Structures are given as structure tokens and as C-alpha cells.
Amino acid sequence: MYNIIMYAIQFGIAVGSLFNEKLRKMWRGEQEAVRILREKVEPDAQYVWFHAASLGEFEQGRPLIEQIRKDYPQYKILLTFFSPSGYEVRKNYEGADIITYLPIDTVGNARRFLRAVRPVMAFFIKYEFWYNYLHILQYRDIPVYSVSSIFRPDQIFFKWYGRGYGRVLKCFSRFFVQNEESKELLNKIGISDAVIVGDTRFDRVLQIKEASKRLPLVEKFVNRDAADRKKVFVAGSSWQPDEEIFLKYFNENRDWKLIIAPHVIGEDHLKTILSLIKDKKVVRYTQAKEENVADADVLIIDCFGLLSSIYHYGDVAYVGGGFGVGIHNVLEAAVWDMPVLFGPNNKHFAEAQGLLRDGGGFEVFDFESFSLLMNHFAEDEEYRSACGSLAGTYVESLAGATNKVLSNVKL
């Protein structure tokens, strides 16, 4: 059944590529993957393979990639992605020697791919459970590790009807899981080699903070040295349901400056954002100059790659996605010692639950709950600062997963 589903997905991508640009990139990338390997793989080199579904999973694996690169330079790094949103952004990443798409997990694709490259070990990040690739790696006695994985009782592996697919988990040499519940669930289905290490994203956001870049135009907008400086609210990875809530508030409150870094930066969505903003001076980052940004009320980030550094300039952050499929990366904001707000779809995100528990994160349900929180932060600077410190402390307290993983891997 699994292989039938994989062939159906492959067929769907092939057909969809005729009409959809994202699927077209994925299809072409998958078709070229083995050719790229045949051209670039050095026969005598030892490759460590990292696979990430998309950009978020790559960021979880990145601390491991760079630590191995630094401490074990004799290895070369192969990095694969499933999604264009990961590959297209990181295809020129200097931390890997070869970067490709991973072809759909059919038997034929897996065999061709692993004939073209024979890694000495593999790391699959978080939710990557590709049976045919994993089965071949296991058959060849190649160690394969699941990193930053997290499991819940409602996942298919732990249901009576998912026992067949659950066999894929037995292909892993070891699991590096985020919490005790994940380890216990694996133990219940006969998998004992699981180590609790936490989430490598905590290490990653601390690295980002350490290496953050100055953004002169954002500094000009924030104007921190001004005697009458306004507080700055940063909305990261926002979607329209998020924007409708916080923009309604800021249309009524002029004591804040607002930076919006929407998840989608297409012109249609940017026009929608502009239509929601009333009576404020708005500047798009790509059009910003020193002379027009200082007295602006709203700065819209209409390009990628800046958000993690932009959070540095905020006093309160909002992370989008909580009114849709799920919140985006709250740790990128929390590491900067400020309160982090997000929508209600956060129950499956351990880091959001941790921030809520420790007092650095706040759940927003609607305009009224958002307004109450923002008014409190505006009126009580000591409270806002204390909540921000709790957010930063939470991130620092859970760092160290990268070293824990590497101490349990034979390199």
C-alpha cells in the first residue's frame, strides 16, 4: 500500500507540474537529483547525508551540519530537501558539498539514489520517515539517525491500523527525541534506542542571535536613541487572519511602531495588508531610504532572509500561523528577550507550550484578547520586560541538543 501511495504522489507531482510552478520545480529537481550526484560525488570521499523536508527542518539540522563540518573535516556533507521552499532558499548553502532534491520514495528512486551516493551515515530531521530509503540504508548497515523527532499518541505509528507503516521506525539506528513522552511511545512499540536530547532549534536560534546582522534601515525606523521613541511590535510570518487582528489594534493605537514580515510576500497579499492599514505612513523595505523610513509608522518586510535579525529590534513579537495550520518559529523571537504572542493552533508545538508555561509566551484568540495583552504591555513596562526575560531564559535553558546528539554518534 505504501509503495502504491508513493507512485500516486509521484504521478500527481508530474501532472501538477504542468500547471503549478512549485510542483514544476520539485519535479525537475527530483529528475535531476541522481544526475547531480553522479557528476559531483567523489568516489573516495565519505559522505554524511542530512535530509530535511523544508526550510524549518533544515534549520533544526543546521547546527549538526556545521558542528560536524568544523570538528570532522574529513567528511563531506550531502544535503537533500523534499520541498522547493527549502531547496530554493538553501541551494547555495556553503555548509554542504552537494545539495539536491530527494526523489519521491519509490523503490526505484531509492535504489538509484543510493547507488549514486553511498553515505557513511544519515540524519533524517524530525518527521522524515521514508521507508524505501531507510530500508536500503538499514540493509547496507549504514547508521541512520532521527534528529529532533517528536511523537504523539495520535500519530499513525501508535494506532492498530498503522502497525505496518510503523515498521519504518525500526530502520533507524537511534532516535534523538525532544521529550520523555516521545521516548515512552517508542518504547511501547518495541523501540528502545531513543535518547532525549531536546530540540536543536534552541542551539540554532542562539547561533543566529550571536551572528545577527545590523540592519541600518531598520535601525533608522526604530530610532532607539530618540527621547520620544515609540515601542516596536514585530509581526513575523503573519497570515491574513493574524493581520486582521493586530492591524485593527494598531489602527486604533498610535503609541507603537509596527514591523510586518508576512509569510507570503506576493503582490496580492501585500496589497491586502496595505488595504487593512488606516491613516499611517507605510514603507516597504525594498523601497526604504533613510529619508523616508525614520518617520514611518509601519515597515513591511517584502523580502526573505531578514526576519531572525529583525526580531532584535522589537519590544513585543507576534508569530503567525496560529489561526491556520500551526504557528511558525517562536524561538527566533523569544531568544531576543521579549514577550511572544501567537494564535490558538499551538498545542502540537512544544516550544510554544513551554513559553506559555514559563510566562514568556501568550495565546491570542481574537481581537479582544490581543488588545488586553497589548494594553498591559503598553501600560506596564516592568511587566513587559519581565515577560521578555522569561522568554529568553526559556530558550537558553534548553540549549545543548547538538552536543548531546554528537556525543551519541560514532564519527
Question: Which ranges hold each PLM region?
Answer:
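Inter-lobe coupling/hinge segments of SF2-like helicase ATPases
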Residues: 202-206, 233-287, 295, 301
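Structural alpha-helical scaffold elements that stabilize or flank donor/cofactor-binding regions
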Residues: 113-115, 168, 292, 310, ...
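C-terminal alpha-helical cap of glycosyltransferases
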Residues: 398-411
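Hydrophobic beta-strand scaffold residues
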Residues: 142-144, 258, 282, 340
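Donor nucleotide-activated moiety binding/catalytic core segment of transferases
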Residues: 201, 283-324, 329-330
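Active-site and donor-binding regions of nucleotide-sugar-utilizing enzymes
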Residues: 14-211, 215-217, 224, 234, ...
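Helix-enriched interaction subdomains in cytosolic or periplasmic regions
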Residues: 1-26, 274
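Catalytic binding pocket for nucleotide-activated donors in carbohydrate/polymer assembly enzymes
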Residues: 172, 188-189, 307-393
